[in-house]
């Protein structure tokens, strides 16, 4: 067990919340008992250091205020012995920028996008003695809160949904084998609501926002870059309770994941048939039950912290009560683009006024995905959304089945309608 009296104090200063969260997870992975502080600007860092020096500073070059380089200069002016370890993360890798930093002796000068595995090893080398291993106890539920109390408080701080097991295993393998080929992983990412949602959120953050919003995974990866996208994904894989391991929760998770993927596939198929935005419809379909998945992850966290065993009825009641509020809170807190949030909302109900084609598509796709297996979707032809889209019973009856290539099916259907 780690000795909390010697647990290192690590200060992270990065204006981008997603990058800061990645750094937090890497520090926790390297040293599970570290005391962490995350600060948004250089003034906060200086004020914090005046009250007590950390054992390590990890600072972004573009930190608001005097900036990362000047902050390093100010830290070195204090002439502490030994010098405070200082990792400077920067996009400036030109010779002049490197020469400007060298006299200030940064412990590490890390170019963006940095290699997460390399940074993790640097952190271990700095924060652990050679051969040292730590085992940190899992905290318990404060005062043994009831599940309802825990879920009510966790809604505004929830990290989101669990990862699909196949995605988590692939990310673990990539980190352990030092393989960083996003092209191999991206098809898996497209199936995972949590990864898709967080990469889109990161791509639309203030630090990344350039012009139009990103509303699909491909757009997000193009803006973030493959290496930073993979870093953020690996950071997610390091988070606590990111797997559903409770046998009672797994069937619920599998059902909801399948519902998300089925809605996404049908929405894209219909959009391709009707000349809508297929990838945007796919994204909204994949994310429409993000809140339900986040509730399951919070229940898993509650169980990991020592919460009592539950019944299936209790889990179902928690999903009914908290699924929609969790989803709304997450989409707002992640600052997903308003247009994407409105499209996700259309899965549940069509508001007043003019309906966009994509909104109608998503609404009918969700209804079709909820039909029991083997039930004919032709019955949906009478629905308002189907009538407004001009969908007849014949087309609805030809909706692709689970596991069928929706793209190939849509192409052939579109040809027959031409």
Tell what function each PLM region has:
Residues 2-3, 116-301, 305, 310, ...:
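Conserved alpha-helical "signature site"
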Residues 17-37:
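Two-component/phosphorelay signaling modules centered on CheY-like receiver
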Residues 38-56:
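Acidic, metal-coordinating helix/loop segments flanking the phosphotransfer/catalytic sites
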Residues 40-41, 67-73:
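Acidic catalytic/metal-coordinating carboxylates
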Residues 57-62, 90:
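Active-site residues of response regulator receiver
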Residues 70, 93-108:
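Alpha4 helix (beta4-alpha4-beta5 surface) of REC/receiver domains from two-component response regulators
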Residues 73, 83-93:
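A short, hydrophobic beta-strand element within the central beta-sheet of small alpha/beta folds
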Residues 111-112:
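A Lys-centered signature of the CheY-like receiver
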């Amino acid at each position: 067990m780690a000795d909390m009296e010697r647990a290192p104090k690590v200060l992270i200063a990065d204006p981008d919340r997603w990058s800061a969260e990645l750094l937090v997870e890497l520090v926790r992975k390297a040293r599970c008992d570290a005391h962490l502080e995350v600060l948004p600007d250089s003034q906060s860092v200086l004020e914090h250091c005046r009250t007590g020096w950390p054992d390590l500073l990890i600072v972004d070059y573009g930190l608001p205020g005097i900036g990362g380089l000047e902050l390093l200069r100010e830290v070195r002016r204090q002439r502490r012995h030994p010098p405070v370890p200082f990792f400077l993360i920067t996009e400036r890798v030109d010779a002049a920028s490197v020469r400007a930093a060298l006299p200030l002796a940064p412990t590490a000068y890390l170019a963006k996008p940095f290699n997460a595995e390399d940074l993790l090893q640097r952190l271990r080398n700095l924060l652990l003695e050679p051969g040292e291993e730590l085992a940190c106890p899992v905290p318990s539920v404060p005062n043994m809160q009831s599940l309802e109390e825990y879920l009510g408080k966790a809604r505004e701080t929830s990290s989101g949904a669990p990862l699909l097991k196949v995605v988590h295993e692939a990310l673990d393998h990539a980190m352990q084998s030092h393989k960083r080929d996003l092209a191999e992983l991206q098809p898996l990412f497209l199936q995972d609501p949590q990864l898709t949602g967080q990469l889109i959120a990161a791509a639309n953050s203030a630090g990344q926002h350039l012009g139009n919003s990103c509303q699909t995974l491909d757009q997000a990866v193009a803006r973030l870059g493959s290496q930073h996208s993979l870093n953020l994904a690996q950071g997610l894989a390091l988070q606590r309770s990111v797997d559903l391991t409770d046998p009672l929760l797994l069937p619920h998770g599998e059902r909801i994941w399948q519902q998300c993927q089925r809605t996404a596939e049908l929405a894209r198929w219909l959009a391709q048939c009707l000349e809508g935005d297929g990838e945007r419809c796919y994204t909204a379909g994949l994310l429409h039950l993000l809140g339900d998945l986040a509730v399951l992850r919070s229940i898993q966290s509650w169980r990991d912290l020592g919460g009592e065993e539950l019944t299936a009825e209790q889990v179902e009641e928690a999903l009914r009560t908290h699924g929609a509020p969790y989803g709304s809170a997450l989409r707002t807190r992640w600052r997903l683009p308003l247009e994407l949030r409105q499209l996700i909302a259309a899965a549940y109900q069509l508001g007043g006024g003019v309906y966009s084609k994509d909104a109608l598509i998503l609404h009918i796709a969700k209804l079709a995905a909820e039909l029991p297996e083997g039930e004919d979707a032709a019955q949906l032809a009478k629905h308002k959304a189907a009538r407004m889209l001009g969908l007849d019973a014949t087309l609805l009856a030809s909706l692709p089945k689970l596991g069928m290539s929706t793209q190939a099916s849509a192409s052939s259907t579109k040809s027959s309608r031409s």
